[in-house]
């Protein structure tokens, strides 16, 4: 009997040894080839993902990249992230290369969790779906459309502050910023303005957003499982809205130009076919994610920096009050007003330089190519990082200093300031985000000054930057 169990133990040990050997061999085989970039690959499956993520959790996502740039004396290095062989491109030259070679040498890549949350797309077709989406969006984000949104944004902002800020001594900024940007997205994308209807989406939407880019393990209790459940709930609600909009369009109760939902329902492809309800629901869901999370992070950090830098706040206040005093009672903001907010936008840009809502993004090499003398194999994942230029002294002298004058005149050098990405995949909602941020700034400084309640509150990045406790502040209302 003892010999039998000893034999089983030996077989088990041998099997594990062979399995580990094959795993290491397979892992390392992805990183073989002539003249690859310098770097290390870490453990099988894990690679350097834990260190990559942990620097963000500690509030310093740039450390992962700057440590390796210094170690290897190279602006491109190899690593292994999210179970994939990867090269990190750091610096303006790397940004320019990736942004300029979209759909030539590289194309977009998303973690598998994204495609599993959006089951109407496979990993291959999701890229085609993204292209279709970008053809639809210009109609919604063209200048004449954006001009119409400003008054709506101002109206929603006034209601938001009346409901959630007024008559309060203290507030927690981050959840309120998310509420504001989500309300705007619901109104402008789907014409949903009723706070109760918006609130029905709000909680499941935040569950979805927080679990979208996680380890795709669909087991009860995991963030990914909760994200799947939340996405199914939201889709069900969206399909009900879509069905009703179809009826309203047929009866003349809604118009094609009403919002992006109407536009999607009436748009056709090259063959004259309309999108089905599931496609539209997924596209609206993707727009809600893209049109809400990044702006809410930018707004939160605007509040943070204006609390820490009273002289910056005062200059923003002065500019905004000059605009406010030029308005008739009850008159909403318009396009001309927003164009006058030059200093305020410079402040917002400096905030996004120091705390970029979009930390970076992945591409995939669709062919072998050479960059900076190093070979990049087909199939490798490529990561560009906003922080690699935003916090580089070569791109921004004294990068730790808050200095809005960096954005005066011609502003930063090309490919150094990239909070919205760049090239063909630059965020199509960049101007939309600018408007909602400036409208928020106008309304908040008109009403309040504020102090941080936690002076040393930790910042975490997961995957966007956010104050660990949501940025609680004490409000000091201004007299009307």
Curated annotation (Swiss-Prot):
GO cellular-component term (any): membrane
Enzyme class: oxidoreductase
GO molecular function: beta-amyrin 28-monooxygenase activity; heme binding; iron ion binding; monooxygenase activity; oxidoreductase activity, acting on paired donors, with incorporation or reduction of molecular oxygen, NAD(P)H as one donor, and incorporation of one atom of oxygen
Enzyme Commission code: 1.14.14.126
Catalyses which reaction(s): beta-amyrin + 3 reduced [NADPH--hemoprotein reductase] + 3 O2 = oleanolate + 3 oxidized [NADPH--hemoprotein reductase] + 4 H2O + 4 H(+)
Entry annotated with the keyword Isomerase: no
Binding site for heme: 427
Main location: membrane
PROSITE patterns reported in the protein's UniProt record: CYTOCHROME_P450
Metal-binding as UniProt keyword: yes
Topology of the protein relative to the lipid bilayer: Single-pass membrane protein
Keywords: Heme, Iron, Membrane, Metal-binding, Monooxygenase, Oxidoreductase, Transmembrane, Transmembrane helix
Organ and tissue specificity: Expressed in leaves, stems and fruit skin.
Pfam family, one: p450
Compartment(s): Membrane
Cofactor names: heme
Chain segments annotated as transmembrane: 4-24
GO biological process, one term: saponin biosynthetic process
PANTHER family: CYTOCHROME P450 26, CYTOCHROME P450 716A1-RELATED
Similarity comment text for this entry: Belongs to the cytochrome P450 family.
Function summary: May be involved in saponin biosynthesis in fruit skin.
Protein's name according to its UniProt entry: Beta-amyrin 28-monooxygenase
């Amino acid at each position: 009997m003892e010999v039998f169990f000893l034999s089983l133990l030996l077989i088990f040990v041998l099997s594990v040894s062979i399995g580990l050997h094959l795993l290491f061999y397979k892992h390392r085989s992805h990183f073989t080839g002539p003249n690859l970039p310098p770097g290390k690959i870490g453990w099988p499956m894990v690679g350097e993902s834990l260190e990559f993520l942990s620097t963000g959790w500690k509030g310093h996502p740039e450390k992962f990249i700057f440590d390796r740039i210094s170690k290897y004396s190279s602006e491109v290095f190899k690593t292994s992230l999210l179970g994939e062989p990867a090269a990190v491109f750091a610096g303006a030259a790397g940004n320019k290369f990736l942004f300029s070679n979209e759909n030539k040498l590289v194309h977009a890549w998303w973690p598998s969790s994204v495609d599993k949350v959006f089951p109407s797309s496979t990993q291959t077709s999701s890229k085609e779906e993204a292209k279709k989406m970008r053809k639809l969006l210009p109609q919604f984000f063209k200048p004449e459309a954006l001009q119409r949104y400003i008054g709506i944004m101002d109206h929603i902002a006034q209601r938001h502050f009346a409901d959630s800020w007024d008559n309060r001594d203290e507030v927690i900024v981050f959840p309120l910023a998310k509420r504001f940007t989500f309300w705007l997205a619901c109104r402008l994308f789907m014409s949903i303005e009723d706070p109760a209807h918006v609130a029905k989406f709000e909680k499941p939407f935040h569950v979805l957003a927080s679990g979208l880019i996680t380890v795709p393990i669909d087991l009860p209790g995991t963030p990914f499982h909760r994200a799947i459940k939340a996405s199914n709930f939201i889709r069900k609600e969206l399909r009900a809205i879509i069905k009703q909009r179809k009826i309203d369009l047929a009866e003349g109760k809604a118009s094609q130009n009403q919002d992006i939902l109407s536009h999607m329902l009436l748009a056709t492809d090259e063959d004259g076919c309309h999108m089905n309800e599931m496609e539209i629901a997924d596209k609206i869901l993707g727009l809600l994610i893209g049109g809400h999370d990044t702006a809410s992070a930018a707004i939160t950090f605007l509040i943070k920096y204006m609390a820490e830098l009273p002289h910056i706040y005062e200059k923003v206040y002065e500019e905004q009050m000059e605009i406010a005093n030029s308005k008739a009672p009850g008159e909403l903001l318009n396009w001309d007003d927003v164009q006058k907010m030059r200093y305020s936008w410079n402040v917002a840009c400096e905030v996004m330089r120091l705390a970029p809502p979009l930390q970076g993004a992945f591409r995939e090499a669709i062919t072998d190519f050479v960059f900076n003398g190093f070979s990049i194999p087909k199939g490798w994942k490529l990561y560009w990082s906003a922080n690699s230029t935003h916090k580089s002294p070569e791109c921004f002298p004294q990068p730790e200093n808050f200095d809005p004058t960096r954005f005066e005149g011609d502003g930063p050098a090309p490919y150094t300031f990239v909070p919205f990405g760049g090239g063909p995949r630059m965020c199509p909602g960049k101007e939309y985000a600018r408007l909602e941020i400036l409208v928020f700034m106008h309304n908040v400084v008109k009403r309040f000054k504020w102090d941080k309640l936690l002076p040393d509150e930790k910042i975490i990045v997961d995957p966007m930057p956010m104050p660990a406790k949501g940025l609680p502040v004490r409000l000091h209302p201004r007299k009307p």
